[in-house]
Curated annotation (Swiss-Prot):
GO terms for molecular function: DNA binding; DNA-binding transcription factor activity. PANTHER family: HEAT-INDUCIBLE TRANSCRIPTION REPRESSOR HRCA (PTHR34824:SF1). The keyword Repressor applies. Pfam families: HrcA (PF01628), HTH_DeoR (PF08220). Keywords: Repressor, Stress response, Transcription, Transcription regulation. Belongs to the HrcA family. HAMAP family: HrcA. The keyword Ribonucleoprotein does not apply. Negative regulator of class I heat shock genes (grpE-dnaK-dnaJ and groELS operons). Prevents heat-shock induction of these operons. It comes from Nocardioides sp. (strain ATCC BAA-499 / JS614). This is Heat-inducible transcription repressor HrcA. GO terms for biological process: negative regulation of DNA-templated transcription.
Length: 337
């Protein structure tokens, strides 16, 4: 009973501190939250929470604020992630359903996450090396020039032009299209490239060799594996009182995409929604920063990560709900192709 009451007091302190940005006192807790006990009892509970390291007193005359340990207990004891409202779900669907390609999906997702959470949003582009081949299309632009289109399971589309040494008729083009699709369809990139290379001898000058060369080249392009989109940096203006401790280091991190990728990578394991709070992260200089992140991708496979980063004083419940909802919706879009 006592433990549950103290947890309720901690929950109230976290919610009030996030909402008001002010240290929280016992009188305010009793007035706002109807805890059913006297201010004296709440003060005793707050003293116990402080002794255990869950809250701290920033100034002698001030109320209490949560510590990283307090935020962690708060997050761990969230029995359910509150669902998005109907209006929020409708907004997510409206914004993301209008995307025309993978780049558009990523850019819309990062803007949406930043708006929903009022934090900095980070979305990693799907990793090419873990993609599978969905389709290969060959389009004759002229009898000696082809447009080769590689479509991956992530929704990524690669296009290459191929100039042929000799003319290629419609029937031969259809046969070639069948051959390359039979070799690569459904395979992960590395296996697809190997299968395609096996179709022709080295330095083959035939149309098949020319098409295989550009397909393998497209499959070897790993530039997108470390591409990320960032949005919502202006949201950090809300935390001006924490500029030196939280905002400045985070602004500097936004310039280093490798740092952001590591933050997302440290926070996520597959499609599990995870939270890293303050000192739990990999960078000491970002010890006042929290990360809420998860993986996304078609089916049950997480090909990339998305999430939000911000000062530890954040709405964890709301941020977790938004990150999970956007990831699920983006995954569905990629799954549907």
């Amino acid at each position: 009973m006592q433990e549950e009451r103290r947890l309720a007091v901690l929950r109230a302190i976290v919610e009030d501190y996030v909402a008001t940005e002010e240290p929280v006192g016992s009188k305010a807790l009793v007035e706002r939250h109807g805890l059913g006990v006297s201010p004296a009892t709440v003060r005793n509970d707050m003293a116990a929470l402080e002794d255990e390291g869950y809250i701290t007193q920033p100034h002698t005359s001030a109320g209490r604020v949560p510590t990283d340990k307090g935020y962690r207990l708060f997050v761990d004891r969230l029995t359910t992630i509150k669902p998005m409202s109907t209006a929020e779900k409708r907004a997510i669907a409206t914004i993301l359903d209008g995307a025309i390609d993978l780049d558009d999906v990523v850019q819309r997702s990062v803007r949406l996450l930043a708006q929903l959470t009022r934090q900095v949003a980070v979305v990693q582009y799907p990793t090419l090396s873990r993609s599978t081949v969905r389709h290969i299309e060959l389009v004759a632009l002229t009898p000696t020039r082809l447009l080769v289109v590689l479509i991956l399971s992530t929704g990524r589309v690669e296009q290459r032009l191929v100039d042929l040494a000799a003319e290629l008729g419609e029937e031969d083009l259809a046969d070639l299209r069948t051959v390359v699709n039979r070799a690569a369809l459904g395979e992960i990139i590395a296996d697809a490239a190997t299968a395609l290379r096996a179709l022709v001898p080295a330095e083959d000058a035939t149309p098949t060799g020319a098409v295989v060369d550009v397909l393998v080249e497209a499959m070897s392009d790993h530039r997108s594996d470390e591409r990320i989109a960032v949005g919502g940096a202006a949201n950090l203006a809300r935390f001006g009182d924490s500029f030196d401790s939280a905002v400045r280091p985070l602004l500097e991190a936004l310039e280093e995409h490798v740092v952001l990728l590591k933050l997302l990578g440290e926070a996520t394991a597959g499609e599990i929604l995870t939270v890293r709070i303050g000192h739990e992260g990999p960078y000491q200089e970002l010890s006042s920063t929290s990360v809420v992140a998860t993986g996304y991708g078609p089916g049950d496979e997480a090909l990339a990560r998305l999430g939000i980063v911000g000062p530890t004083r954040m709405d964890y419940a709301g941020s977790m709900a938004a990150v999970r909802a956007v990831a699920r919706y983006v995954s569905r879009i990629l799954d549907e192709g």
